[in-house]
Amino acid sequence: MGYNFDRSISRRNTNAMAEEGFANYLFGADAPALALEMPREELISMWVADMQFAAPDAAIDAITERLKHPIFGYTADLDEQLYQAFHSWCAQRYSWHFAREEMQVSLGVIPALFALVEYVCRPGDKVLSLTPAYGYFKHAALQRDREFVTSRMLASDDGKYSIDFEDFEAKVSDPAVKLFFLCHPHNPTGRIWTSDELRRMGELCIANGVKIVSDEIHCDLLRTGNAHTPLAKLFPGSPDIITCMAVSKTFNLAGMMIATVIIPDPELRSEWKRRHYPFVNPLSLTAAIGAYRDGAPWLDALRLYLDENFALTQHFLSDHLPKAKFRVPEATYLAWIDLRTYFDDSVNLTRFFLEKSGVVLEGGEMFVENGDRRVRLNLACPRAQLRLSLERIRDAIVKQYH
């Protein structure tokens, strides 16, 4: 079956964050007015991590069928359908198994992060993460009155990131650290952590009484030839590991607001059930079941298309911005590009590229720390859009600095 990922789909007038909600998110309500050098309707959204592709028919058809039933009352994950579809997905793709009672449902991974900080940590406890980091790791800790501490990753000359285990061990040994947010695969760098890296992080956390929330939301979006190993698979039955996955990134269903959270610890699971909002959108539940049951062919085709988008990006940067450092990520649809040779620390790259090129992207300052003068570019878009964005980025750099 063919899939048309080259199709351009306008999202204007759909209340899409990607096109209509970026200003407050990226700059805040009190930021100075933007000095755009082109009309707002010509801006290109390359920032937030959802796709510019139509969701798979597997999800759309499931929603369409559910719409034939005219009642949309309170709904929860009460039967076996989601578990069977999701467990089968994980078993086939990752040889990973978990019991029905361990699987909980959340209104997205972000709400799960906020909840788990509160359920695991007391006020004043510390939450650890690797940086650069997904910003909501920090937000989840600070907005629940927990301290957020970091371990900076190391970047090699060719752009590959690794864990500074000496620093990580020192941080995780702090008795006040009670929770570690692991991003696996990693956003924004695209690393898939190896089994050795995962075991070492897991062993250090468990030895120090630190629970791990493994955010594996990007796990299905691998480059060809790569494989993902769920952290929990390496520590069977461990009560110290909570795994978050979702259809949102995999099948472009982020707005459906549904995620699965695997909680092996009976005590923590009881706390989750006692305090967590149990309902889900009936269309979201149906979409997730349909996607996991029948969405694999679409995903396989998508991954090949993304491989080609990354190859295009690598060749373009090599030819037109040779001082940029870029390594094709092992997973995700996000390009993490090092532009330190073109900019100094005084430039806010998010604002610069929006104003000078009309490309809405996220500068490294959006990723807590350790991302200075880098940008994250979302490549889950039609190839023509990607090519135009890269050309605009190149032209803005050349015009401003050379």
Label for each model-derived stretch:
Residues 352-361, 367-402:
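PLP-dependent enzyme catalytic core of the Aspartate aminotransferase-like
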Residues 144, 207-208, 357, 400:
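Helix C-cap/helix->beta junction micro-motif
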Residues 4, 10-108, 115, 293-294, ...:
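N-terminal small-domain helix-loop-helix segment of the aminotransferase-like
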Residues 71-203, 220-224, 228-234, 238, ...:
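Conserved core of the PLP fold type I
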Residues 237-307, 314-315, 397:
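Conserved core segment of the aminotransferase class I/II
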Residues 306-314, 326-339:
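Conserved glycine-rich beta-strand-loop-beta hairpin in the small C-terminal domain of fold type I
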